Amino acid sequence: VLSIVDLLEQWCVDRAAAGQKILGLCAPPGSGKSWLASQLQIRLSVASLSLDDLYWPQPQLQQYQRGLPGSHDLPLLKQVLADFRQHGKAMAPCFVKGLAAGAGDRQGQRPLVGDLLLLEGWCVGARGVPTLQPYQAIWQQLDGLLLLRPPSYGRVMRWRLQAEAKQRQQGGGALTAKQVAAMVLAFYGHLPAEKCFAPLWQQPQLPTWQLQL
């Protein structure tokens, strides 16, 4: 039986063979997007960029709720994607969630080099509410989109709590259970799954594949 990493690897190989360069990965908070991307980097010439790395630095980030539309530096993200498409490499900021008492902040940069660039995030590709409109120019730069669908959106809370617990064990700042609950409720209150995510597989606007988690 193929693992989800095996399936993702084959998907990337097929997309690269089709001449695609920049792919999107949309999956719920705490579902292991960054871990999956890191596994692909071991197996393939894939550069991985998290939408989280494009959060505004402090203190600008304090004007937004982290993770919601508006909290990302879209002009910089657009430039990073354009550089990668043109040159096969780019420089991207690093966002460390354990800084600023768990609120997170930017810390340095890192190179993106590979045959493919995977942009991963919980709302990559999403549409359907006005606050997502500025993001559509970003999504239009994607050659394809993979959706990892949770068995239920109630499972997302548990996954996010586990992710924060792991971050705490590693010595970084982490959100409390109350803060996690508020964050996840805000995420799906602001971007309802039925309105912002269901259309991605029901009425796709770019080549789209999906896997059930």
Predicted regions located by residue number:
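Extreme N-terminal, non-catalytic leader segments
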Residues: V1-G24, P28
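Short loop/turn elements that form and flank the Walker-type P-loop nucleotide-binding site
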Residues: A18-G19, P111-V113, Q140-Q141
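Anionic group-transfer/hydrolysis microenvironments
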Residues: C26-P28, L54, W122, P151
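Conserved lysine of the Walker
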Residues: K33
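Hydrophobic positions on the alpha1 helix immediately C-terminal to the Walker A/P-loop
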Residues: L36, L40
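Conserved nucleotide-sensing/catalytic segment adjacent to the nucleotide-binding pocket
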Residues: A47-G104
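Charge-patterned, long linear interaction tracts outside catalytic cores
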Residues: R106-V124
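Conserved NTP phosphate-binding and transfer environment spanning the P-loop NTPase/kinase superfamily
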Residues: L116, C123-L213
